Amino acid sequence: MVSTSKIKSVDFYRKIPRDLTEASLSGAGLSIIAALSMIFLFGMELNNYLAVSTSTSVIVDRSADGDFLRLDFNISFPSLSCEFASVDVSDVLGTNRLNVTKTIRKFSIDSNMRPTGSEFHAGEVLSLINHGDETGEEIVEDSVPLTGRNFDTFTHQFPILVVNFYAPWCYWCNLLKPSWEKAAKQIKERYDPEMDGRVILAKVDCTQEGDLCRRNHIQGYPSIRIFRKGSDLKDDNAHHDHESYYGDRDTESLVKMVVSLVEPIHLEPHNLALEDKSDNSSRTLKKAPSTGGCRVEGYMRVKKVPGNLMVSARSGSHSFDSSQMNMSHVVNHLSFGRRIMPQKFSEFKRLSPYLGLSHDRLDGRSFINQRDLGPNVTIEHYLQIVKTEVVKSNGQALVEAYEYTAHSSVAHSYYLPVAKFHFELSPMQVLITENSKSFSHFITNVCAIIGGVFTVAGILDSILHHSMTLMKKIELGKNF
């Protein structure tokens, strides 16, 4: 049986009676410094243990979300009408989707980007069957040519004024011309302007009356506008826009359209109508809407290959003057991939505090052409997309996000100008992994801090004590 004395012999911490120890002022000072150092270093170690540390690596893209990528956008075009705004998508694999509408919404806006109503619905804009009468007869011009000087007079004089805004070089305008003039003749015979005075058909040459056409926000030719008592303002379910005709363009269809507009209007006695014409026009005159722009928003699924998102004016029955098109725009939002949920985004930022500075790089940026760049200006954006994946310490993928860099430029186009977003995905991805920390490592470091400081302080105290003792002995030797 092992005796108690033998067990005591392995004691590392043998006690010295307090009566045999001696306290000193220098030792007390070192003890205070050592205690403060222990507390400070322990706090630093605890902070380091609680802090999140990550490691970043670049690996080959291992996306698990398939071959398609979600693209969300919200872009405002102050000079492009929703009537003709078209969203197109193409890629290097041959995909070419024109005028995407299923997941796209359009809202008319004014020049200050303010919405002028609810969602824009174009209806059957581009589904014309007849573009005009096929005739070889000589065209007799019966429609009234309008200019900037007499336009307001005619719009106030007639309760219904149907105007064809055209350009002589336009193919569709030339197809419309015979049926338009024949319809004008039939309407003039049916509703005599002098005796009836309810309706008249007119035309405006936009190559000669550019200011007048711009004032009425004419962007495509031909544009058939309907003016009622001096204004073409249409108020439909809080949506304010220009009233236009989108139907067939043969003579019969045009006449039928005009008759449907005139029939609800009560025919006044001729003299009374002439007497009250100016008063009625002043009372019922409405300010023309400043609805010349469009906000296009929505999403689409694009393939993970280099591709293009383009917004331009497009129509199967209109022509456009490229020199008058202005593709200025404001990118309200543009992002790739699924949106990060708010509860995950806070964790996302916690693991990577610097991530997100380049997220949605184009958001809020304006690209305005003040006509100082000349005509036919295409605005291009080159986007390089990199996927970033954040993985927690337990191996769980927290979130997958797509960030991009953006470089923008302008180019003079030989064709119709567009707003073009070229996107290209990197074959590599950034992997951010949370580093796990061992609690045993933390305890080891704390013990090392306490023991190390205590030992170093003891060594310093011993050196200081022996130095002072030696100095006292030297002084005593000198006195003898």
Curated annotation (Swiss-Prot):
InterPro entries with a match to the protein in the record: Erv (IPR045888), Erv_C (IPR012936), Erv_N (IPR039542), Thioredoxin-like_sf (IPR036249), Thioredoxin_domain (IPR013766)
Membrane topology note: Single-pass membrane protein
Active site: C170 (nucleophile), C173 (nucleophile)
Cystine bridges: C170-C173
Site (Lowers pKa of C-terminal Cys of active site): R249
Tissue and organ expression note: Widely expressed.
Subcellular locations according to the entry: Membrane
Bilayer-crossing regions: 439-459
One matching Pfam family: ERGIC_N
Source organism superkingdom: Eukaryota
GO biological process: intracellular transport
UniProt GO cellular component terms: membrane
Family membership noted in the UniProt record: Belongs to the protein disulfide isomerase family.
Function: Acts as a protein-folding catalyst that interacts with nascent polypeptides to catalyze the formation, isomerization, and reduction or oxidation of disulfide bonds.
Protein name: Protein disulfide-isomerase 5-4
